């Protein structure tokens, strides 16, 4: 599907890149499966989970290279996680995902919201009884998630393609999910996976609506002032962006702030680094979301480069109807689901050791219902980070619109580094 427009070289290469990177991940995944088969003599979930305590007691080790013994459980978990890194686009196996924008926009929405990129997160959560016994693997996941979350968010700030900005935001949000897996907050990771699907599909389809209206223009610097002619698309994109930045009351707020709170409570090595990265990422997310909304829908029209046969207008109802359908859960689903998520709605297939159970600590000490969490959201650190990001974006794009050009001119090396994707 990424290579759907097969006559374009860029689309063909993007499909090939996605295929190759995922085969690298699959190598780790199949090694993990082979090790499970070797040690457990089965590939059935229930058999493996039942035999884990017995396997841990044996203290089996694997010599990765001569003179180096690693616990077999850690090697298995790390191999499985390498598979998840490719599917869920974690650094350094993330490079296929921005290029997947070569596919049609509804395909981008499908890949990023509901199918491929969530597969790795789901697999790790499903294998939680195995991962819980490897602090090494949990710590690795926490650090990798933090790196992805922060550094992929930074790349979104300099993008000019509307779809690529949303794609990098997906990478950043996947980083949050992997941080949650690393701190044993599996239910929070699945909850964010669930809420993220709605607002990410909304953002992609909203971007698609803009692209259709502008005759397939994707450069945000050739847009502007679209709120006058596309009010419904504008409202939908603002709702999606508020959920993305985690504005209190939106579905993204409940799942993302939950992950940040649980990470702060975790004792896993690397958790406090991830907490700091998550807070900085809230700031960065607000900057690039505000930038996208302002440059596309507000300010002066910059469509002189496009030759339009007719004035810009909202596309067909078939494009607008899904935006309305997705905007409702993007606001409401988080508040509805937060209580059942914390109360053990997913406890059947998930397993957490008592010493890692940050969710129970949060439930007993800090959670007093969806309304209390909403009100507390306005005095929390993530909200302050969000406000700071909003202020910086306002200064750069409304108060002093020439400031980004000055910064770009003075920081040529940094801009070159970001444009080369590190």
Task: Name each model feature, range by range.
Residues 1-311, 315-318, 329, 335:
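Hydrophobic transmembrane alpha-helices and their helix-loop junctions in integral membrane proteins
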Residues 313-422:
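Membrane-interface and transmembrane segments of multi-pass membrane proteins
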